[in-house]
């Protein structure tokens, strides 16, 4: 609720980091707000194909009393316990393809997102942070790349797009395989 918005120029001047818990960069083109909790200890991703393992919590940002019936703050789906980040259930697995500034992803294997939303494509809001993170293969919850996102319907799941609602995410990104 009480976030400090910074613009992209400030974000780049801070070496693509947000400096406070409540500091979020607004990416105007997508409408996504991002707070970098941990950039990761790996290297920036270059052109190629990667297997990414993610843990996430998805929460509603608005109350809806229509077809979807949700309260702001409701957990919509998750595969991570937000108060216990070392809790390890099955990660969300997706194949990421990077080509220049283009990022695309497809969920594979065990997928909570597919089970919940019946979509195989990774939401664009999930892909945007990967341009600025350094994911690695790590078992340390302190070293894994981690962000908080405020995602508008247009960069979210197919259901968020259909019913026009924004979501909050906390997501980790780890290199798989």
Regions from the language model: what does each represent?
Residues 1-177:
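Cross-family detector of peptidyl-prolyl cis-trans isomerase
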């Amino acid at each position: 609720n009480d976030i400090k918005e910074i613009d992209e120029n400030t974000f780049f001047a801070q070496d693509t980091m947000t400096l406070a818990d409540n500091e979020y960069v607004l990416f105007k083109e997508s409408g996504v707000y991002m707070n970098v909790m941990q950039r990761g200890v790996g290297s920036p991703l270059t052109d190629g194909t990667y297997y990414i393992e993610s843990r996430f919590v998805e929460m509603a940002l608005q109350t809806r009393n229509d077809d979807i019936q949700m309260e702001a703050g409701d957990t919509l789906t998750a595969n991570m316990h937000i108060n216990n980040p070392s809790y390890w259930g099955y990660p969300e697995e997706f194949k990421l393809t990077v080509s220049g500034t283009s990022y695309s992803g497809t969920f594979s294997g065990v997928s909570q997102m597919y089970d919940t939303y019946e979509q195989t494509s990774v939401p664009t809001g999930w892909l945007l942070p990967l341009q600025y993170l350094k994911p690695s293969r790590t078992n340390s919850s302190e070293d894994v790349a981690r962000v908080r996102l405020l995602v508008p319907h247009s960069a979210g799941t197919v259901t968020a797009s259909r019913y026009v609602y924004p979501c909050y995410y906390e997501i980790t990104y780890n290199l798989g395989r």
